Curated annotation (Swiss-Prot):
Residue positions binding substrate: 110
Functional note: Formation of pseudouridine at positions 38, 39 and 40 in the anticodon stem and loop of transfer RNAs.
Subunit structure: Homodimer.
Catalytic residues of the enzyme: 52
GO biological process, alphabetically ordered: tRNA pseudouridine synthesis
NCBIfam families assigned to the protein according to its UniProt record, in alphabetical order: hisT_truA (TIGR00071)
Naturally occurring in which organism (per UniProt): Stenotrophomonas maltophilia (strain K279a)
Catalyzed chemical reaction(s): uridine(38/39/40) in tRNA = pseudouridine(38/39/40) in tRNA
Protein name (database record): tRNA pseudouridine synthase A
Length: 256
């Protein structure tokens, strides 16, 4: 039997999603340990998209296979009670055997939030980035539109990125402000390592007036990571979750 889970987590205390076997706790290892305890047998999960250390997940989707019979609600609640307080299973549904959390997804969504004021955050320091320079979100939004479409995003990929190529389709990019908080929301078919944080780091330079709006288009065309902006800090980034065709019968928040 194959199940899909929707998982929410605060990434502050983890070295990332992936279980690499050493170097500190991972979200994946914590989830697999809890699931295995419920099943009373070892279980492994496959996720829709891996996140880095300090990055959060609002509705990460995973799947796992098991012969153990449990009600979906028992998987959800039983697993959550065995997890650290920074991880929760939001839902569990049985899925077809050919459903794949990663390969069945048609899009992925991220949100980056930063506090734009002179003084650093105290209360929300684990879920907000911070920029003391005054930023113009309208300039950031205008600049970001140059990235929409299928492009080579080499200028915004990490040097550690292991993807075979840098072509990705960015479907939308919206920059907005609510009071002192600027939000960058993106959706694409897939993302390169550090791609969202590198885009945000470059957009900040446009918003501060250090670079013109046209600079983002020039970066994209130049494909040179060394001349783009710095990588934005991880704590402002949330993986909102993937999106799937409706034939998989998943909850509405992850369905196209």
């Amino acid at each position: 039997m194959r199940y899909a889970l929707g998982v929410e987590y605060d990434g502050s205390d983890f070295r990332g999603w992936q279980n690499l076997g050493e170097g500190g706790p991972s979200v994946q290892a914590s989830l697999e340990q809890a699931l295995s305890s419920v099943a009373d047998t070892p279980l492994q999960v496959v996720c829709a998209g891996r996140t880095d250390a300090g990055v959060h997940g609002q509705c990460q989707v995973v799947h796992f296979d098991t012969d153990v019979v449990r009600d979906p609600r028992a998987w959800m609640l039983g697993t959550t009670t065995r997890l650290p307080r920074s991880i929760a299973v939001r839902w569990c549904v049985p899925v077809a055997d050919d459903f794949h959390a990663r390969f069945s997804a048609r899009a992925r969504r991220y949100r980056y939030r930063l506090l734009n004021r002179e003084v650093r955050p105290a209360l929300d320091r684990q879920t907000l980035s911070w920029e003391r320079r005054a930023l113009d979100e309208t300039l950031m939004h205008a600049a970001g539109q140059a990235l929409i479409g299928e492009n080579d995003f080499s200028a915004f990929r990490s040097v550690q990125c292991q993807a075979l190529h840098a072509r990705r389709e960015l479907q939308s990019l919206q920059v907005s402000r609510q009071g002192e908080v600027i939000e960058v929301a993106v959706q694409g078919n897939a993302f390169l390592h550090h791609m969202v944080r590198n885009i945000v780091g470059s957009l900040i330079l446009v918003g501060s007036g250090e670079k013109p709006v046209e600079w983002i288009a020039e970066l994209l065309a130049g494909r040179d990571r060394t001349v783009a902006g710095p990588t934005a800090p991880p704590q402002g980034l949330v993986f909102l979750g993937p999106l799937y065709p409706d034939n998989w019968h998943l909850p509405a928040e992850v369905t196209l």
